[in-house]
């Protein structure tokens, strides 16, 4: 399985979904997953599967002794694994820039030379595919499709690509031709395509001209909260109500609609504060918009948050809002609902297909969004109902069930 990020080092929902999905799959006794990421940090959860870092896979032979390898990468990889991979280098990659172990360095992020890293990752995938014993190749999102294709060419094994988003979602239609080409190439080479929602499935079929018979919607789920998160004290109940937006502050997420709706709410009640948690290329623009609307004293920008910090924000919030213009799925409302926070989501989000106990509005309908915000902070009975029923609903949406659906697709491909 190829991915680009994995907890605790994540920049969005892709890593969170990768973790939940792999854990759900591994609940099946006869399922073993090897998960490949560009750069491991050593603190990933390896309790249920094997993790390989592309930055520890040699593509050029280096004659190095065991102790040296252990000293260099022993915190993230067993030296024996390094030698096993080294024995399966299949071509002369001496023209590539490699380090003292014959490995390519990866940033583990989304650098300016992203397409170069994607290409390098696909080279490493070939070595891994020649070394590992496996039945299926599963590639998460466009960044890993080239790696999946190369692994398929090397091994002859079936390729499943998992669409967490398309460039039509990320760009509001202003599609990057290079990204589109990478995505379409992945879809064309895939034996099956999984999409995180029916809306994404339709996009893949219509915009990328794929056979509907090989495209399936497999909705995401949510990971049960661990005791450390459950122990975070509930900070609601002070005088002011808190309404939160949490996510990348980018065009796709619709942050400007949150600000405009907040302005309308404050025309009717002053006992509300707004949090915009996250970072992104529209953050400065949103700070200026808040100042222009004269609501800076009611607005808080926290910057990027991760891990426990995210749940501390949920536990301090009365309402969660996700006004995304295009959201293939959207795990964050499910996480908020786990903390008993009623959620308002856009009808243009994939999670709207499976959630009954969330308020749904069109992303562009600022009046409807403001009405929903106002209602949830003004009517305790409505707030209590959605808090209780929403919690029950998300507790029934399990990654284990997603794993069973994915297993059925695997079995179909292998039969």
Predicted regions and their residues:
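Carbohydrate-associated surface elements
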Residues: 199, 221
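A conserved catalytic-core segment of Leloir-type glycosyltransferases
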Residues: 31-129
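Conserved donor-binding/catalytic core segment of Leloir-type glycosyltransferases
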Residues: 194, 237-262, 275, 387
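Short alpha-helical donor nucleotide-sugar binding micro-motif in glycosyltransferases
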Residues: 304-305, 312-317
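Short hydrophobic beta-strand element within catalytic cores of glycosyltransferases
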Residues: 342-345
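Conserved acidic donor-binding segment of nucleotide-sugar-dependent glycosyltransferases
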Residues: 358-367, 375-380
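Aromatic "clamp/platform" in nucleotide-sugar-dependent glycosyltransferases that forms part
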Residues: 325
């Amino acid at each position: 399985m190829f991915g680009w990020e994995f907890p605790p080092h994540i920049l969005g929902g892709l890593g969170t979904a990768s973790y939940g999905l792999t854990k759900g799959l591994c609940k099946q006794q006869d399922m073993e997953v090897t998960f490949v990421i560009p750069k491991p940090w050593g603190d990933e959860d390896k309790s249920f599967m094997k993790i390989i870092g592309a930055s520890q896979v040699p593509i050029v032979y280096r004659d190095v002794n065991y102790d040296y390898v252990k000293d260099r990468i022993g915190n993230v990889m067993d030296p024996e694994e390094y030698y096993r991979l080294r024995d399966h280098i299949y071509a002369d990659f001496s023209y590539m820039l490699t380090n003292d172990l014959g490995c390519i360095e990866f940033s583990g992020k989304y650098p300016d030379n992203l397409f170069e890293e994607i290409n390098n990752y696909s080279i490493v995938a070939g070595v891994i595919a020649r070394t590992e014993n496996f039945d299926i190749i599963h590639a998460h999102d466009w960044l890993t499709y080239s790696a999946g294709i190369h692994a398929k060419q090397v091994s002859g094994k079936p390729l499943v690509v998992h669409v967490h988003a398309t460039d039509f979602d990320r760009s509001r239609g202003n599609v990057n031709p290079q990204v589109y080409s990478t995505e379409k190439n992945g879809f064309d080479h895939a034996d099956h395509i999984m999409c995180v929602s029916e809306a994404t499935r339709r996009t893949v079929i219509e915009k990328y001209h794929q056979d509907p018979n090989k495209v399936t919607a497999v909705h995401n789920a949510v990971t049960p909260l661990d005791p450390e998160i459950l122990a975070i004290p509930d900070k609601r109940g002070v005088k002011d109500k808190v309404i939160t937006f949490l996510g990348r502050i980018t065009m796709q997420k619709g942050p400007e609609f949150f600000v405009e709706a907040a302005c309308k709410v404050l025309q009717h009640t002053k006992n509300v504060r707004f949090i915009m948690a996250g970072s992104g290329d529209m953050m400065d623009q949103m700070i200026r918009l808040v100042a222009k609307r004269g609501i800076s004293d009611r607005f808080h920008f926290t910057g990027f948050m991760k891990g426990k910090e995210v749940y501390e924000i949920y536990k301090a919030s009365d309402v969660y809002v996700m006004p995304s213009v295009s959201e293939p799925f959207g795990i964050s409302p499910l996480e908020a609902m786990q903390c008993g926070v009623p959620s308002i989501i856009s009808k243009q989000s994939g999670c709207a297909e499976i959630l009954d106990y969330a308020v749904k509005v069109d992303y562009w309908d600022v009046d409807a969004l403001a009405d929903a915000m106002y209602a949830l902070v003004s009517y305790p009975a409505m707030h209590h109902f959605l808090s209780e029923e929403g919690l029950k609903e998300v507790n029934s949406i399990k990654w284990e069930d997603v794993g069973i659906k994915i297993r059925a697709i695997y079995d179909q491909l292998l039969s």
